[in-house]
Amino acid sequence: WICYYDGNAEAASHQQWTEGAIKRQEEKYPDMYQVCDPVEGSSQEAAYSAAKEVIATYPEIGGFIGCDTNDPPGIAMAVEEAGKAGDIAVTGTCLVSQAKDYLNSGTIKTFTFWDPADAGEAMCSLAEKVLKGEAIEDGVDLGVAGYEKCTVKDNTVYGAAWVDVTTDNMSDYDF
């Protein structure tokens, strides 16, 4: 059993991540199912409160995935409070500054983010290409790791520069 958090309902990226996670889960893990519709909220307190409710209602839940950076630490707090650290998986998009204590305790084993410096550099490279009149199309190389072969769809440029964070590499990031 799993519960998804989609963070801010106004954020298209959160909706896309949630939809993608659900699709992947249905394809790869057909015996796993959602216990509820994706939970909405964009604060650590909201994630904590909702996770407490989900854990109370579905004590056999196996995991949570959060798309807003506030979700994993809020969920992890509820998981620890319920005494279920190690029994309930918690992951999603987060920052080291928010989740390092939960990584160290093992309540969160891994989470993902995009390095804002790399994303900013890629956006500057993209802006430079646009100003020079260069074609922005599938395969465009923005010269930044993870943005060497971007996908372009509906005026949106997608890279593959996510960073998976664990206790092994969390000290590499100071944000």
Where in the sequence are the language-model features?
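A residue-level marker of the well-folded mature domains of exported/periplasmic proteins
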Residues: 1-175
